[in-house]
Swiss-Prot record:
Source organism (scientific name): Mus musculus
InterPro entries noted in UniProt: Snf7_fam
Protein name: Charged multivesicular body protein 2b
GO molecular function: protein domain specific binding
GO CC term, one of those recorded: lysosomal membrane
Coiled-coil annotated spans: 25-55
Bias (Low complexity) ranges: 179-194
Length: 213
């Protein structure tokens, strides 16, 4: 019983209108078919009266045929109007649905805007940016400290490499001679004296090889 008193929605009203329009269209088509049938009968009657020479009957039947054809033409006009109304109803239904969707979207946006505090959102973004900058600065400081720690040993190794390269360029293989030098464990002259002697001899040998007395 509750469904009987339920308020009709827009869709329900449009569906009823479409059903009525379709019923009207079918009725118009039936009427046109009946008129076409009468038209053929009148044409046959006119031909029959013409054969027997009954001019008066031909004239009366011809007037009836003219009126009938006018009525048939009207059915086409009405049918076209009904089709137009059906199309217009569908367009209106589509527009109303779009309007409903837009209304729902507007309400959703309004609710979101009420929940969202622009000032609070801006503050949150600023805090994020500030903390991100702190993190980047901390990371940079840690990297600089690590570079300072490891760069010291690298500098020492690099300095030793430069010294060896210079000695190699003037023909002194100090590393090789150092390997052949007597160790401090043996009862021989001190390491500093051996190094100096080896270095002098090596220099003299290199000079002689170059042809310098």
């Amino acid at each position: 019983m509750a469904s009987l008193f339920k308020k009709k929605t827009v869709d329900d009203v449009i569906k009823e209108q479409n059903r009525e329009l379709r019923g009207t269209q079918r009725a118009i088509i039936r009427d046109r078919a009946a008129l076409e049938k009468q038209e053929k009968q009148l044409e046959l009657e006119i031909k029959k009266m013409a054969k027997i020479g009954n001019k008066e009957a031909c004239r009366v039947l011809a007037k009836q045929l003219v009126h009938l054809r006018k009525q048939k033409t009207r059915t086409f006009a009405v049918s076209s109007k009904v089709t137009s109304m059906s199309t217009q109803t569908k367009v209106m239904n589509s527009q109303m649905k779009m309007a409903g969707a837009m209304s729902t979207t507007a309400k959703t946006m309004q609710a979101v805007n009420k929940k969202m505090d622009p000032q609070k959102t801006l503050q949150t973004m600023q805090n994020f940016q500030k903390e991100n900058m702190k993190m980047e600065m901390t990371e940079e400081m840690i990297n600089d400290t690590l570079d300072d720690i490891f760069d010291g040993s690298d500098d020492e190794e690099e300095s030793q490499d430069i010294v060896n390269q210079v000695l190699d360029e003037i023909g002194i293989e100090i590393s090789g001679k150092m390997a052949k030098a007597p160790s401090a464990a043996r009862s021989l002259p001190s390491a500093s004296t051996s190094k100096a002697t080896i270095s002098d001899e090596e220099i003299e040998r290199q000079l002689k090889a170059l042809g310098v007395d």
